[in-house]
């Protein structure tokens, strides 16, 4: 009987200590919280070269913070990495310029980025014409 009472008291003590530790951990996380609601974020600056992992600096009143960010290596530098566009299909090849053109409309501006409403992208016309394959290679019906 005494062993059972000891185990119950021990269990209650362990639960009380662990809940207090969790409460302290939660309060510790709140210390860094801010009253600011109007954050102004700068553009993502890569750590090396012109794409990959980087940092973005934000300010609110007299407070400054840095966030980790990432610039995809296939982004269009003219548009900015924080501006997301929905693009149409590529147009026909222009024989005089030797390029195909397509336009995109702004879908989303991240971190209050200053983005153009519509943009145009161009790429050189391909020299080869793609032909449809007549049969599947590899695994399949034989």
UniProtKB/Swiss-Prot annotation:
PANTHER family recorded: MIDKINE, PLEIOTROPHIN FAMILY MEMBER
Pfam families per UniProt: PTN_MK_C, PTN_MK_N
Chief localization: secreted
Annotated localization: Secreted
Statement: the UniProt record of this protein carries the keyword Membrane: no
Record-given protein name: Midkine-B
Keywords attached to this entry: Antibiotic, Antimicrobial, Developmental protein, Disulfide bond, Growth factor, Heparin-binding, Mitogen, Secreted, Signal
Claim: Cell wall biogenesis/degradation is one of the keywords in the record: no
GO BP term, pick one: response to bacterium
Function: Secreted protein that functions as a cytokine and growth factor and mediates its signal through cell-surface proteoglycan and non-proteoglycan receptors. Binds cell-surface proteoglycan receptors via their chondroitin sulfate (CS) groups. Thereby regulates many processes like inflammatory response, cell proliferation, cell adhesion, cell growth, cell survival, tissue regeneration, cell differentiation and cell migration. Inhibits mesoderm formation and promotes neural formation during development. Plays a role in development of the neuromuscular junction (NMJ).
Disulfide bond sites: 36-60, 44-69, 51-73, 83-115, 93-125
Domain of life the protein comes from: Eukaryota
UniProt cross-references to SUPFAM superfamilies, sorted A to Z: Midkine
InterPro entries noted in UniProt: Midkine_heparin-bd_GF, PTN/MK_C_dom, PTN/MK_C_dom_sf, PTN/MK_diS_sf, PTN/MK_N_dom, PTN/MK_N_dom_sf, PTN_MK_heparin-bd_GF_CS
A GO cellular component annotation in the UniProt record: extracellular region
Tissues and organs where the protein is expressed, per its UniProt entry: In adults, expression is highest in the brain, eye and bone, with lower expression in the heart and lung. Not expressed in the ovary. In the tailbud stage embryo, expressed in the head and tail regions as well as in the central nervous system (CNS).
Molecular function GO terms recorded: growth factor activity; heparan sulfate proteoglycan binding; heparin binding
Signal peptide as annotated in the record: 1-20
UniProt similarity note: Belongs to the pleiotrophin family.
């Amino acid at each position: 009987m005494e062993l059972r009472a000891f185990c119950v008291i021990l269990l209650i003590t362990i639960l009380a200590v662990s809940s207090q530790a969790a409460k302290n951990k939660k309060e510790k996380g709140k210390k860094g919280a801010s009253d600011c609601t109007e954050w102004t974020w700068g553009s993502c600056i890569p750590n090396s070269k012109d794409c990959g992992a980087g940092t973005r600096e934000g300010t609110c009143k007299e407070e400054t913070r840095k966030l980790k960010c990432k610039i995809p290596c296939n982004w269009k530098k003219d548009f900015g990495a924080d501006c997301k566009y929905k693009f149409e299909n590529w147009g026909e090849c222009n024989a005089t310029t030797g390029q195909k053109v397509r336009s995109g409309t702004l879908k989303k501006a991240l971190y209050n980025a200053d983005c153009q409403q519509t943009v145009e992208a161009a790429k050189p016309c391909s020299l080869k014409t793609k032909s449809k394959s007549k049969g599947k290679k590899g695994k399949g019906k034989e």
